[in-house]
Amino acid sequence: MDRIENAQMNSLGTRKLYYENVHQTDFTAVVMECVPDKEEGYYRIVLDASAFFPEEGGQSADKGTLNGQEVLDVSIKQGILYHKTACEFPVGTRITGHVDWNRRFDFMQQHSGEHMISGLLHSHFGLENVGFHLSDREVTLDMNGEVSLEQLRLIEQEANAYVWKNLPVNISWPTAEELASLNYRSKLALTENVRIVEIPGVDLCACCAPHVDTTGQIGLIKVVNVQSHRGGVRINILCGNRALADYTEKQDSVWAISSLLSAKQPEVAGAVARAKEDARLQKERANALQAELLKVQMNALPSPEKVRHVLLFVGELDAIALRNAVNTLTGKYSGYCGIFAGDDTNGYRFIVGSASCNCQELADRMRRELSAKGGGSAPMIQGNVAVTADTLQTMWASL
């Protein structure tokens, strides 16, 4: 491992440019260490200074490049930043770094929005944030108590009202004495080098991550999901451009549904409910007709004196009706009684029963010869198979 000894870096860690200027995306720095990871085939680069925020505080690391080479990850240990790259950089050389600003700003919007929601839940309901995760795909915050959807909607409305006020987001590094006098949110008991993020009247929290300059830069805060989680709730939020993209996607869906169902946009939920109920009734009627057709087919079967095994094909029919029909047949015929629901194109659901034959033996054969899926017991088996009706009739003829 190559290394340049640097007393200041060893005592204070890498100079963190994102704390000096959160908007800085381009920088130059000297390579202090180049640590090969032989197992992974990567290198971990230590610089004297870096604008890359690492994976820390529940947030994924910044993305970007060093000398045009992709930075795959950034981690921090004892204040030193390690940049994971596929390329080796000689120790002592000066290199150029670039941070993906669009992604940085996106994460700033999400994290500042999370502070506002968590801070308001804390001040209104005494809830503590006990978990936080921010990645490219989601923002989740875990609270240690229950909150109703109605309460959450009020919190969301209040948070956005503070966004519109364009409040400053203040960053400070209070002394130990100053820290002792502050009533701030924190998951850990901290005593020194504590970075405080303040949104006046909304939140006061210890945090290591980059934040927006003012609440107006967040743009929009939207709660998109809430569910019970470990005695509390897990809340999913989207802020800024993510919230806009989510709204656009959902608006496109509403437009499409509105057109398909010939309903006004505010009325699509009711239109979908009616369409669902209509489909249920249609399915019930279709099942009733299929059940009647099945009875006709069963009555048309040869007598038990002429055949031992019987096989029937029907359209879509619910499992209860299929099972009842098979039970009726097994009370009449001594061999395998099979009913297959479906068609040659989409495959068949089946139930096979017998009062005297071992249906598990038939299931084994169907798996071997027809790649059928399913199982059951000696009196009855059920499953799925993707073959033609002719193939099944050939098998039944061989029983």
Model-predicted segments: where are they?
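A glycine- and charged-residue-rich anion-binding loop/surface
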Residues: 1-399
